Amino acid sequence: MHEMAICMGIIQIVEEKVRERSSSRVRSVCLELGTLSHAAPEAIRFCFAVAAMRTVAEGAALNIVELPGVAWCMSCSKSVEIARRGDCCPCCGSYQLQVTAGEQMRVKALEID
């Protein structure tokens, strides 16, 4: 389950930002998660709750903003939304797609006391 390693990294980022601001607690974390990132949102939620135990993030809400997968079709020269790798172009049916967005994962915002 690589989601636990991801959440441990998120907690490290959160703790670093809390130290920088001399704060003591995190109320919420906003995470942008691309649909092509290979991370399951529900697994991320579960692992975040476990990873946050006994840290400044314990009890913090995790808000996940899911970002769509986007690819450039080399056949019809259009930017198209895709649900997963291996999908065909919804415009022309070609499989010659280059992923341009949807693989990202980042901490977008923190609400800190």
From Swiss-Prot:
<dbReference type="GO" id="GO:0008270">
    <property type="term" value="F:zinc ion binding"/>
</dbReference>
<comment type="similarity">
    <text>Belongs to the HypA/HybF family.</text>
</comment>
<feature type="binding site">
    <location>
        <position position="89"/>
    </location>
    <ligand>
        <name>Zn(2+)</name>
    </ligand>
</feature>
<dbReference type="GO" id="GO:0051604">
    <property type="term" value="P:protein maturation"/>
</dbReference>
<feature type="binding site">
    <location>
        <position position="76"/>
    </location>
    <ligand>
        <name>Zn(2+)</name>
    </ligand>
</feature>
<keyword id="KW-0479">Metal-binding</keyword>
<protein>
    <recommendedName>
        <fullName>Hydrogenase maturation factor HypA 1</fullName>
    </recommendedName>
</protein>
<comment type="function">
    <text>Involved in the maturation of [NiFe] hydrogenases. Required for nickel insertion into the metal center of the hydrogenase.</text>
</comment>
<dbReference type="InterPro" id="IPR000688">
    <property type="entry name" value="HypA/HybF"/>
</dbReference>
<keyword id="KW-0533">Nickel</keyword>
<feature type="binding site">
    <location>
        <position position="2"/>
    </location>
    <ligand>
        <name>Ni(2+)</name>
    </ligand>
</feature>
<dbReference type="GO" id="GO:0036211">
    <property type="term" value="P:protein modification process"/>
</dbReference>
<dbReference type="Pfam" id="PF01155">
    <property type="entry name" value="HypA"/>
</dbReference>
<dbReference type="GO" id="GO:0016151">
    <property type="term" value="F:nickel cation binding"/>
</dbReference>
<feature type="binding site">
    <location>
        <position position="92"/>
    </location>
    <ligand>
        <name>Zn(2+)</name>
    </ligand>
</feature>
<feature type="binding site">
    <location>
        <position position="73"/>
    </location>
    <ligand>
        <name>Zn(2+)</name>
    </ligand>
</feature>
<keyword id="KW-0862">Zinc</keyword>
